[in-house]
Amino acid sequence: GVIGKELAKALPQYTDKTRLVSRNPKKVSEDDELFEANLLNSEETMKAVEGSEVVYLTAGLQYDINVWRTQWPLLMKNVIDACKKQKSKFVFFDNVYSYGKVDGRMTEDTPINPVSEKGKVRAELNKMIMDEVEKGNLKAIIAKAADFYGPETPLSFVNIMVFENYKKGKKAQWFIDVNKKHSFTYTPDAGKGTAILGN
């Protein structure tokens, strides 16, 4: 996805060895190593992680609650198990669904309080990671990001309703309460920030 691409662009600042793992991996930089794997398969995940000092998980699944409930915990278990076995540091790029409704700023101290079914799945994933960290079995950090905008995000709310309208000489549209603050994440910044967290 777009965050994986932006992360891959940022990683050469920290390492000369980047392995991109996907069902259909494509190079972002000339020196990228490509590794085809399905992270729902534990053996393929183990092989994909083998030899890695840092593992970044930026994968996405179909935006469907039934898929999320069944596939996300399995995928996460496979990645956690592989990182534990390989002694790899783990960086999970997550959204903010697990926070639920927040009045004010979101920080590392914001409580996990999901109000949606997808938020409950994300909270479960966060718990899976942090349980292993607290037991001393895993070094991990969870990056959180709000709604995206930026290059290669043509379907983002901001791109469609604001920037595309401006390009056409139209007024921007906004379907959110104009009196409430709403955070957005610029995708190149998300990639750079995620790279920093692993180094």
Region roles according to the model:
Residues 4-5:
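N-terminal Rossmann-fold NAD(P) dinucleotide-binding loop
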Residues 26-86:
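NAD(P)H-binding glycine-rich loop region in Rossmannoid oxidoreductase-like domains
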Residues 95, 127-152:
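Conserved beta-loop-beta element that borders a ligand/cofactor-binding pocket
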Residues 118, 146-155, 176-188:
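Glycine-rich "substrate-gating" loop/helix at the edge of Rossmann-like oxidoreductase active sites
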Residues 123, 150-162, 197-199:
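Glycine/proline-rich active-site loop of Rossmann-fold NAD(P)-dependent oxidoreductases
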